[in-house]
Structures are given as structure tokens and as C-alpha cells.
Amino acid sequence: LFFLINLGYFKNYPTKKKRKMKYLFVLLFAGISAGAQIQKEQLNLMPWPQNVVINEGNFTLTKNFKVNITGNPNPRIFGGVTRFLRRLDGRTGIFFEQGFIAKLNEVPNAELQINCTKSGKIGLYEDESYHLDITSNKITLNASSDLGALHGLETLLQMLQNSSTSFYFPASKISDFPRFTWRGLMIDASRHFQPVDVIKRNIDALAAMKMNVFHWHLVDDQGWRIEMKKYTKFIELASDGLYYTQEEIKNIVKYADERGILIVPEIDVPGHGSAILTAYPEIGSKVITLTGGTSEKNIQGTAIATYGIERNAGIFSPTLDPSNPKTYQILSGVFDEVCPLFPGAYFHIGGDENEGKDWDANPKIQEFKKKHNLKTNHELQTYFTMQLAPMLKKHGKQLMGWEEILTKDLSKEAIVHSWRGPNEGMAAGQSLVDAVKKGYKTVLSNGYYIDLMYPIASHYLNDPMPKGANLTAEEKARILGGEATMWTELVTSTTIDTRLWPRTAAIAERLWSAEDVVDVENMRKRLESVSFRLEELGLTHIRNKDVILRNIANNQDIKALEEFSNVSEPLKGYTRNKGGTEYQMYSPFTLFADACGPDAKDALGFNVAVNQYLANKSADNKAKVAAYFTKWIAVHQELTKLSANAPLVQPLLPLSKKLNDASQELLLVLENKSTLKASDLKGLIEQCNTKDHADVELSVYESLKKLI
């Protein structure tokens, strides 16, 4: 119509009437656009549900939107729905008339109807499925338990869309359930203590990503973090005053329960014992030979060694004495006090990285091994582990430990936590296969060590179900799921969120969604939206980057630092803290490497631009590549200026200079104007592969190589 009017087909119509026809056409087109159906691929759902069907129409939100709950849910559903409403009004700015939901069937004609048939029990094997049906005038959420309903509410929040003037949910049907029953995150609160608010906001994030286990690593060489009423030396001598009171722990457990999260505490024994033995050295294995004088004796007559809280990272000798009855007396008392704080069915006893050096050097322990026909330290550790099992069982707890606990004599009730891989000289996931074949339930963490700064794709494509392992259906059923692990040797409360999120959301999808949901680029697209939305839960993973950069810039303009961080990544694996001694637990973690993360944004974009240019050397594609080089040249200039009044910028200049030099020459290469020999050009690019500056590396190196 618009086309015909302009061609003169309606030339005999009055001008005013023709204007009206054009106006009606614009309105008609706008209406068609506003009503255009969203495509499934445009949704930013994570984890991706098992089944999604998009239908015609939308449910438009107004202030009259209300929620009603029916069935027999756990009371946690009321808090969950209230939080849902607050997050929804926070996103939309709509002043909903409904404030707090406190009882069943309060608003029978509400637009959102939630029905739960039973009260969900926190733990494994609960039905977490849900069914969400959105029409143009009603939303129905059905779930067997309130845990499933909470998951459904998270999906509903992610379904929220907007036009220029309103917010709506696309009409759809979603049926969903988790693939694995154990979908966890471990946070190490020993090496760097993590305050209560850090723990709570990350529990909120776990719930948002439909994860259901929080593994709380509370005791290691670097500190004891649980208030003890009986054995008070733990907090007096081994905590640096940084610990959770029992009331704080109870409060966090309640907080997690309200969000459907199981908490699994960990006290790491018999190795990683520096903090424990700082408090109670009499149960240590180390032998001290006295040259004179007298010394207090432990009950076996061995001089008591002096231990201290460990300030470095790594594997250390202090180990509990498995031959000493007092070891079990103290641990039994600890479990009697700690187990009631955690109502869940599982207790993690660590059991990893015990090299047995102090055991080998202690004659009494060697005598104990012979007496009990224990041929190896591994068998001795199994003996130790099996003494703990009844202590935990008394409190209704199942024992769980890192994969080193696995021996032929281990009780089949124990859960084996698989963690070692190529970094430890092992085949990835081999212990998981060994465990399930021997009849043990197991959880995978190898491949989910997010503290090691590996690319997100490496975690996302790491499936707990091993390929080609030839497992029976029964053996596969013993693979409970997986757990992301956040060790905190190089992580403080300021940086922990930036290391956890949004990458943990990709792991959450691997543990929840169907096995064939493996499109990395699609995941990245959705993750960008998910990351933004996680901020509403109080996570600091986006804003704290700028906090660190402002400190580095000495409160000057941080734009150049931001741009440089977009091509820089922290050194990966264990290379940032070689030998565990470059940093101590009290070192500053406010450096440039702490502001950087894996999957540097501009590195990803530059790689795409280079690939497009190499496939089609058009002027447009060449300009896109050149724009990056121009930017990096300017960044080096700005960093140089910035460093005049910002000493913390100085360590970056050698690296930014190398990128600057490569960029200048590659601009000439793009124009066929470079006069450098091929070997010299290659050497210039190789300079960008250095790992010698500021504990970061340039993540554009591989893409730069493609251009020569």
C-alpha cells in the first residue's frame, strides 16, 4: 500500500486521505512486528530445558498479575514465590498489587497458578521435574514437589521478553527435568575465608541455575573455619580469627534449604592437616628427635611436633596419626558437634593428597601397619577412613571423599569424588570409571576446576558420562553427576564471583540438560544474558572487575585497562603460582591478572574477524581486522600515559608493547606493505606468546599467527 501510494496509484485521492492511509500502514506494520512470534532459538534459557514448544500469542504483564499456590508443598515455596515476584517487578518496574505470598489458595483466580503435590525433601533422588504452560491469559506451573516448582519459576523468569512498551511471556509449553541428580559447586573457605554474604549470594546463583548441591570446604592446611564449643583450640589457634559461628552455619543451612540446596560440609583428613595439628599437635604423625631437655609426650611416647597454619599453596606433610587412639577421640568429638549443624545425608572427609611422608618416618606407625597387616599407606588410609564411617553413620551421614579413598576394603556406602586428570598425571575420569565398575556411586569434578582459568568450552563439553567406557546401565546409574570446584589459593571475596560466574552456569547446563545440548556458540549467546541477570542476585562478577581496574589506575580513566583486559587472560592451570610459593594467602590479589578472566571478549571477536577475512578477503572483512589493530595501538599509548601516575600499570607495558608492535606490522601486512622478512614477522608474533608479564597471557596469539 505504501509503495502504491508513492507510485501515484492513488493520485486522485485527497492529500490528507493519502497521509492517513500511510499512517494506517505504519500502524499495521508495527502491529505485525509487535505480534511477531519469538523463535525458540531466540530464548536465553539456561540450563536449556528438556522440551520447549513455542505457541501463538503472548502473556502480557500488568500490575494485576497475581500468583496462587495449591497442593501440598513445603513452606519454602512461599518465600520462593515472593522472591520471584520481587525479581520480576525489579526487572519490569511494574508495581504489582500482590506483595507477599504466605498461604495456600489465597488468590484462586490468579493468572499464575502453581500446583505442587508434595513437600520436597532436600537431597538426592527427589523429583525436580516441572511443567510450564503459558497462554495469552494464564500461566500454569505443575510440579511433583516444590523443588520442581522453584526450578519452573527460574525458567519463567528467563522467558521474560519485552517490546518497546511492555513485558510479556511468550505462549509456550515447557516440560523439564534434570539429567543428573548431583549438580554441585564446591567453595573452598579454608585457603581464603569467604564471608557469609559471599556464601549466600552464591547459593542464590546456584538456585537460579537449577543446581542443588553446595559443597563447603571448611578445613584445610590454611585454616579451620567452624566454631567449636568443645575443642576450642581449633578457632583459637588455627583460624586466624576467621571462622563461621555455629549460628551463622545454621542460618546458611536454612537459607540453602529455602532455595532447594543441599549443603555437604568437608573436613579434610588425614592429610592437609596443618591447621588441625596447629590446634592439636599431639595427634600428628611427625616425629621430633630431641637433642636434650624434656618435652611433653603424646600418649605413645613420641615428642610432639610444632605445627603452624600453612601460608602457601601445595601439598604438605602434616598428617593425622592413624595409629593414635586420641586422633579418633578428637575426630569423634568434632563430628558429634559438627554433624548436627548439617541435616543433609552426606559428609565429605577429603582424604586427598596424602603422600604419607610422616607416616613413613614414624617407627610407631610402621609398627602399627605390621600389627594390622597393612602393606601400604593406601591400606593404612583405608583403615583410617573406615574408623570414621561409624562416627558419621551415628549421625545418619554417608561418607564421601576424594578419589584417593577408593580401595578394595572401602565400604560400598561411600561416595567417591573423582578429581584427578592430566594435570596429576592421570587419565581424565579414570577413577570415576573404576569406582562405578567396583560398585561405588561417584561424582565428577575433573574438568570442572573453574579456578584453573580454562576456557568455558572445556568445561561445557566435559560430560560426566564417559565416552567409550562400556558401562552397564547399572554402572551408569552410579554416576550421580558433577561438581564445579572453586579452590581459593588465588581467590578472595573480592574476586571469587568473577572466577565462578558466569562459567558455572555452563557447567550447570551440562549437568541438567540433554546430552546433545552441546552447541558452544549458542551457549555463549545465552550466557551473556544469563550473566547480566545474575547481577540481580547480588553477584559481583561484572562490577568488581572495574573495582580492581580503578585501583590499578589509581582512580584515573580505566578505559585502556578495560580494553587490554579484553585480550588478556590469567595464566592457566597451576602456572600462575608455580610451586605454590609465588603467592601467600595474605598476598595482594588486586592485580591485573585478578581483573582478567578466561574467554577474553575481544580475543573471541578477533578470532571470528580473522576467520571471516581469511575466508573472504573483502574490504569490509579487512577493515574489521584492521580496527582491532588500530585499537590495540591506541591502548598501548594510553597505558603508557596512564602509567605515569599509576605504578601498577607499569608491569603491563612490556606486554602491551609487544601487541602494539605486532599490530603495527600486521596493518602493513593487510595492505601488502610489510618489508619484514617472513622469519622476522614470525618472531614479532611469537613475542605475543610470552607468559612473563603480570601473570597474564595475550589470548589473541593463535589468531595473530593465522595472518602470517
Tell where the protein language model's regions lie, with residue ranges.
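Beta-rich nucleic-acid/ligand-interaction surfaces
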Residues: 102-108, 222-231, 406-412
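Flexible loop/turn segments at secondary-structure boundaries
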Residues: 75-77, 193-195, 221-225, 270-276, ...
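A structural preference for short, hydrophobic beta-strand core positions in alpha/beta folds
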Residues: 98-100, 265, 401
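N-terminal leader/propeptide and maturation segments of large enzyme subunits in energy/redox metabolism
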Residues: 350-374
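Substrate-binding groove of N-acetylhexosamine-processing glycoside hydrolases
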Residues: 45-48, 53-55, 260, 318, ...
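Contiguous, structured surface segment used for ligand recognition
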Residues: 37-180, 513-514, 518-520, 525-537
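Feature activates predominantly on carbohydrate-active enzymes
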Residues: 119-346, 362, 387, 391, ...
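Bacterial Sec-dependent N-terminal signal peptides
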Residues: 1-41
